[in-house]
Amino acid sequence: MSVSAIFGARVVTIPSVLRTSSVDGRTVKLQPSTGGSCGGGVITIECSSRPQKKGTAHHMKTRPKKTARWDIKRGPAVYPPLPPLPAEWTIVSSAVDEADSSSSTTSSSAEIAQSA
């Protein structure tokens, strides 16, 4: 829950007047600064009166609502399952490679003999 939801649009917090700090076993009293850009140590939080919705919240707010009686209990469309995907990798054995290379060599030598 945000601060603006509890206390309203504007919240002002005032730090304590005196603070104590111990340095090397000695107690030192510190006072808030009276100058600077914060106006004397006062913190002001301003909240937007109309905050902007983020992605999914905005989508859920603006999407069409089911108002028709037949549409209220309707589920998502059912499609037939997709066919299985082909394998990305196929295993090729070295014996098949040797047979392919020897057959291609003999066929190429036969082609050379025919052309000569």
Curated annotation (Swiss-Prot):
Q: Can you provide one Gene Ontology molecular function annotated for this UniProt record? A: structural constituent of ribosome
Keyword line: Chloroplast, Plastid, Ribonucleoprotein, Ribosomal protein, RNA-binding, Transit peptide
Transit peptide start and end: 1-47
Instruction: Please verify whether the record's keywords include Disulfide bond.
Output: no
Which Pfam family is an annotated match for this chain, by its short name?
A: DUF5323
Its localization reads: Plastid, Chloroplast
Please state the protein's primary subcellular location.
plastid
For region Disordered, the annotated ranges are: 95-116
Disulfide bond entries: none
Q: Which GO terms describe its biological process?
A: translation
Which InterPro entries did the record assign? Ribosomal_cL38 (IPR020526)
* A GO cellular component entry from the record: ribosome
Q: Does the keyword Ribonucleoprotein apply?
A: yes
- Similarity-based family: Belongs to the chloroplast-specific ribosomal protein cL38 family.
Note the subunit structure. Component of the chloroplast large ribosomal subunit (LSU). Mature 70S chloroplast ribosomes of higher plants consist of a small (30S) and a large (50S) subunit. The 30S small subunit contains 1 molecule of ribosomal RNA (16S rRNA) and 24 different proteins. The 50S large subunit contains 3 rRNA molecules (23S, 5S and 4.5S rRNA) and 33 different proteins.
Q: Which PANTHER family match?
A: 50S RIBOSOMAL PROTEIN 6, CHLOROPLASTIC, LARGE RIBOSOMAL SUBUNIT PROTEIN CL38
**What is this protein's function per UniProt?**
Component of the chloroplast ribosome (chloro-ribosome), a dedicated translation machinery responsible for the synthesis of chloroplast genome-encoded proteins, including proteins of the transcription and translation machinery and components of the photosynthetic apparatus.
Q: What is this protein called?
A: Large ribosomal subunit protein cL38
Phylogenetic classification of the source organism? Eukaryota, Viridiplantae, Streptophyta, Embryophyta, Tracheophyta
Gene name, Swiss-Prot/TrEMBL: PSRP6
